[in-house]
UniProtKB/Swiss-Prot annotation:
<dbReference type="InterPro" id="IPR003959">
    <property type="entry name" value="ATPase_AAA_core"/>
</dbReference>
<dbReference type="GO" id="GO:0016887">
    <property type="term" value="F:ATP hydrolysis activity"/>
</dbReference>
<keyword id="KW-0547">Nucleotide-binding</keyword>
<comment type="similarity">
    <text>Belongs to the CbxX/CfxQ family.</text>
</comment>
<dbReference type="InterPro" id="IPR003593">
    <property type="entry name" value="AAA+_ATPase"/>
</dbReference>
<dbReference type="InterPro" id="IPR041627">
    <property type="entry name" value="AAA_lid_6"/>
</dbReference>
<keyword id="KW-0067">ATP-binding</keyword>
<dbReference type="Pfam" id="PF17866">
    <property type="entry name" value="AAA_lid_6"/>
</dbReference>
<dbReference type="Pfam" id="PF00004">
    <property type="entry name" value="AAA"/>
</dbReference>
<dbReference type="InterPro" id="IPR050773">
    <property type="entry name" value="CbxX/CfxQ_RuBisCO_ESX"/>
</dbReference>
<dbReference type="InterPro" id="IPR000470">
    <property type="entry name" value="CbxX/CfqX_mono"/>
</dbReference>
<protein>
    <recommendedName>
        <fullName>Protein CfxQ</fullName>
    </recommendedName>
</protein>
<feature type="binding site">
    <location>
        <begin position="85"/>
        <end position="92"/>
    </location>
    <ligand>
        <name>ATP</name>
    </ligand>
</feature>
<comment type="function">
    <text>Necessary for the expression of RuBisCO.</text>
</comment>
<dbReference type="InterPro" id="IPR000641">
    <property type="entry name" value="CbxX/CfxQ"/>
</dbReference>
<dbReference type="GO" id="GO:0005524">
    <property type="term" value="F:ATP binding"/>
</dbReference>
<dbReference type="InterPro" id="IPR027417">
    <property type="entry name" value="P-loop_NTPase"/>
</dbReference>
Amino acid sequence: MLDVATSAPSAALPAEAAEGRLDLGALFTESEVPEFLAELDEGLIGLKPVKRRIREIAAHLVIGRAREKLGLTSGAPTLHMAFTGNPGTGKTTVALKMAQILHRLGYVRRGHLVSVTRDDLVGQYIGHTAPKTKEILKKAMGGVLFIDEAYYLYRPENERDYGQEAIEILLQVMENQRDDLVVILAGYKDRMDRFFESNPGFRSRIAHHIDFPDYEDAELVEIAKTMAADADYTFSPEAEVAIEEYVAKRRLQPNFANARSIRNALDRMRLRQSLRLFESGGLADRAALSTISEGDVRASRVFAGGIDAPDYKPQTE
């Protein structure tokens, strides 16, 4: 379970209404939301449709605050969301940024993100589920609760499954305490669609559905370079070409997980580079210690027609 706290202070927007008018540009700037959106743009490669939706939601919330300042009706917005898409497409990262935005605008008190799965909510025996679920909700209050692979909460084929108890508690809190908690349900799009069909209570409480597309090959190559640079590594020119080929081949294999697959592949490349340098002996400068060679990339089983190590293993249903 992940519990990430943000450092942004909770404060009302410091804008002044003069003669019944507001400077929306100043209001937006003073909210610090542009900073969070810029971080989202710079920190996440691709995902243009997702960034657009987050920008729309942020703008709607800022305008809602402006309406309040001028005495217009601005009821509490429903902010529960559904993030759908394949693994490794940035859903958790965007959820954390959304928590920061909501906190800065005063829609949640603390602005932290609590990330959970079914195992964190559902017990294994009678009387175990309610305390587990309520404890998680208590920890998430004032922030955002992110439930990954939310459809695993619902297992109608098992009459003795306790997931339904967790669902009922969640639905009640999402309705009655929506001014103090935002819930984001995440998972594969097709499974989430079936989950909502079987649980209309969730569908009626979700205001924003955001689909996270798979990354393009070029975007994954750029992600690999960025991840390497963040760890003080670079690819040789030949290795960059090999990375492009790796991405194209790896995408066709089972359990491909977008950026997660790239991160895991990079970890293996670094291991190969370390072994290569260790076995070579002799002197090594900064360039040698930080450069991933073509051989470090092509040593992957992907290039031999084999199956790369699994990057994502979904739960069994």
